[in-house]
Regions:
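Short glycine-rich His-centered loop
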Residues: 2-25
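Acidic/histidine-rich helix-loop elements
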Residues: 17-28, 53-57, 88-97
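Residue-level recognition of beta-strand->loop/alpha-helix junctions
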Residues: 51-53, 125
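Glycine-rich beta-strand-to-loop/alpha-helix junction loops that act as flexible
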Residues: 9-11, 55, 82-84
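Alpha-helical cap/lid subdomain in secreted, periplasmic
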Residues: 2, 32-46, 61-129
């Protein structure tokens, strides 16, 4: 049976109330439903799902966690939802993160992932209602 390790990373959307002492607890958000879908769609694959999303995280936090919470885990697939905390909480104050810094941090994350896994694919499509 083929094994695939899928890592969910990001902010509160990924955290979704997960238990921090159990990285295999997927909370009550999209990681839980994505895992259920994938298990049903691909029953011949032995998935290991890991959720390390942390509510309130920004791109700079993920950069700080790259080694321990991305590279050392050696995932086959990575799902990242991050960015809203970089802009939402600071839209009206002086701690706003400039676009170029946000972009640089995001590129650091993506490059680290793309160089640490054997296959890379990036989808920037957003859901359409």
């Amino acid at each position: 049976m083929k094994k695939i390790k899928l890592l969910f990373q990001g902010d509160s959307i990924t955290d979704a109330g997960r238990e921090y002492n159990d990285c295999h607890n997927l909370g009550e958000g999209y990681p839980k439903y994505a895992a259920k879908y994938l298990k049903n769609k691909f029953p011949d694959i032995d998935f290991e799902f890991i959720d390390l999303g942390i509510s309130g995280n920004q791109t700079k936090d993920l950069v700080g966690r790259l080694q321990n919470d991305f590279i050392d885990i050696k995932p086959d697939i990575v799902s990242i939802l991050i960015g809203i905390n970089d802009v939402w909480h600071h839209a009206d104050d002086k701690s706003w993160i400039p676009n170029d810094i946000f972009e640089d941090q995001y590129r650091i994350i993506l490059n680290a992932i793309l160089f640490s896994i054997t296959q890379g694919y990036m989808n920037t499509d957003t859901a359409k209602c």
